């Protein structure tokens, strides 16, 4: 793992969290219990404080940063998709930010809300609970359905379970020269399928 102190502030990572070895955490970063931080994620707490609350996940290639005297927060069970950028914003409890979305300074994503992939949430946006947000700039198009929230929670549980699986079995290795016969397939821990 790449952890860096900055001006005396050292990242804090709960012992039950998993931070991928290629992720980078700098300075004023606080990672809660059961959090998953994916490969190549960058949490750069050299200006504002970055807080990832219990059970949340920050997936591959995500960036978190913020201005001085601000907190950038991912709430409990927050789900941040691959390549998303969070800058000086608040992601509410149980909310999902889709892949490659950008959430700007002072924006608030409400609890149990979903930001569609590739959306741009403008600075200062104030979302409400359980909204589906999409577009550039993002706008609320409707409420999140019970089925969508259930699907989101199943996906988040997969990442929460992945934390333990990574602690047990993830290690650096050399590649095989060819695929072995009867190569097994990995299985998830929930019955989640892609949302269409």
UniProtKB/Swiss-Prot annotation:
Disulfide bonds: none annotated. Signal peptide: none annotated. The keyword Repeat applies. Pathway: Amine and polyamine metabolism; carnitine metabolism. Residues 174-196 are annotated as: Disordered. Pfam families: Hexapep. GO terms for biological process: carnitine metabolic process. InterPro entries: CaiE, Hexapep, Transf_Hexapept/Carb_Anhydrase, Trimer_LpxA-like_sf. Belongs to the transferase hexapeptide repeat family. CDD domains: LbH_paaY_like (cd04745). This is Carnitine operon protein CaiE. The gene is caiE. Overproduction of CaiE stimulates the activity of CaiB and CaiD. One of its GO terms (molecular function) is transferase activity. Changing residue 126 to H: In strain: O44:K74. Keywords: Repeat, Transferase.
């Amino acid at each position: 793992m790449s952890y860096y102190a900055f001006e005396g502030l050292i990242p804090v990572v709960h012992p039950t969290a998993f931070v991928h070895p290629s992720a980078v955490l700098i300075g004023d970063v606080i990672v809660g219990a059961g959090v998953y931080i994916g490969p190549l994620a960058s949490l750069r707490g050299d200006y504002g404080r970055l807080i990832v609350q219990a059970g949340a996940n920050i997936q591959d290639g995500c960036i978190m940063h913020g201005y001085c005297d601000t907190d950038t927060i991912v709430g409990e069970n927050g789900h941040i998709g691959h390549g998303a950028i969070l800058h000086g914003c608040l992601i509410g409890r149980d909310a999902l930010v889709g892949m490659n979305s950008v959430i700007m300074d002072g924006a608030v994503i409400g609890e149990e809300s979903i930001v569609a992939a590739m959306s741009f949430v403008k600075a200062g946006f104030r979302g409400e609970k359980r909204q589906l947000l999409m577009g550039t700039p993002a706008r609320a198009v409707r409420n999140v359905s019970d089925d969508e929230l259930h699907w989101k929670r199943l996906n988040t549980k997969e990442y929460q379970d992945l934390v333990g699986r990574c602690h047990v079995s993830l290690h650096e290795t050399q590649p095989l020269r060819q695929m072995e016969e009867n190569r097994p397939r990995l299985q998830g821990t929930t019955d989640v399928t892609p949302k269409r």
